[in-house]
Design a protein with these regions (language model features):
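Catalytic domains of riboflavin
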Residues: 1-308
Length: 308
């Protein structure tokens, strides 16, 4: 049986205007729900053609949908069908659209391809579209597959990694019985049609390996009764949460360094609650690090203490 390709191979084909197959494996968990091994045909929206849309509709058995970042859809004033509207496993669904200058009703492969390209065109404005139409947009969660491991987020992530607009087109692949195709079928399907195939799991690993996922917001010395620490304030680009690194002494020597991962506890750390020992643990860590001469405390906020 043919195997999976690398994310790098998939990116190269996407940049050359080809379709790829994107698979979430059976053990993938999305929004707390068990995945079913679903596979999707995917390509960059800006390179979509009538032939590619026709292929998706004939071979995937499903009408193609457009996936895009939240910011991109908001700029085009494309909103949810109803506030909070969600499709299967949490996919966020928008109101269907047609490009205003489609030749016919918008249902043909040519018209759908035009609408999809318009949705990815940086020059497009809300006035370029009419609603309802025949192309349904799906809104990706900020943070992509590192926030939600779905096809919507994966396709937008791949588009961005491919240096394209954050807009893609996907279509779920069905087998001959009309059911969602399983992984062996998807591997054979990709091999038969010469498509690269990769998993969302591998995309998650690729992003974690190649991207810097935190940003330094501020740095400041902080005198304490245990000595002077340097405080580094970071913000996660995935969940937008703040993280604090309290550094004491020189930790760049390559020698083993004391490190504490501390779950932030307002009541224990700052208010002196006797219902937990969080504050005591933090002070003890600062004291031990000062005695050792160097070390780091990573302070993770929004992890409230046990006892309140």
């Amino acid at each position: 049986m043919p195997g999976f390709n690398t994310i790098e191979d998939v990116i190269e084909d996407l940049q050359n205007g080809r379709m790829v197959v994107l698979v979430d494996e059976r053990d993938t968990d999305i929004d707390g729900q068990e995945a079913v091994g679903e596979g999707e045909l995917m390509m960059l929206a800006e390179l979509t053609t009538a032939d590619s849309i026709n292929f998706m509709m004939r071979h995937a058995g499903n009408p193609p949908m457009v996936t895009a970042s939240k910011e991109h859809l908001e700029a085009l004033e494309l909103h949810h069908t109803v506030p909070g509207a969600q499709g299967p496993r949490g996919a966020s669904i928008g109101v269907s659209v047609n490009a205003r200058d489609t030749e016919n009703t918008g249902v043909s492969a040519q018209d759908r391809a035009l609408t999809i390209r318009k949705l990815s065109d940086p020059a497009s404005t809300p006035e370029n579209f009419i609603q309802p139409g025949h192309v349904t947009p799906l809104r990706a969660q900020p943070g992509g597959v590192l926030r939600r491991a779905g096809h919507t987020e994966a396709s937008v992530d791949l588009a961005q990694i491919a240096d394209s607009r954050p807009v893609a087109v996907i279509a779920a692949i069905l087998d001959e019985t009309g059911k969602l195709a399983d992984t062996p079928y998807l591997l054979d399907f990709a091999h038969e049609h010469g498509f690269k195939i990769a998993t969302i799991h591998d995309l998650i690993a690729h992003r974690r390996r190649t991207e810097k996922l935190i940003h330094l917001e501020a740095k400041s010395p902080m005198p304490t009764r245990f000595g002077e620490f340097t405080v580094y304030a970071y913000r996660s680009l995935v969940d937008d949460n703040p993280y604090i690194a309290m550094v004491y002494g020189d930790v760049s020597s390559g020698e083993p360094t004391l490190v504490r991962m501390h779950s932030g506890c307002l009541t224990g750390d700052a208010l002196g609650s006797l219902l937990c020992d969080c504050g005591e643990q933090l002070e003890r860590s600062m004291r031990l690090i000062a005695v050792a001469g160097s070390g780091v405390i990573v302070y993770i906020q929004h992890h409230e203490g046990r006892g309140i």
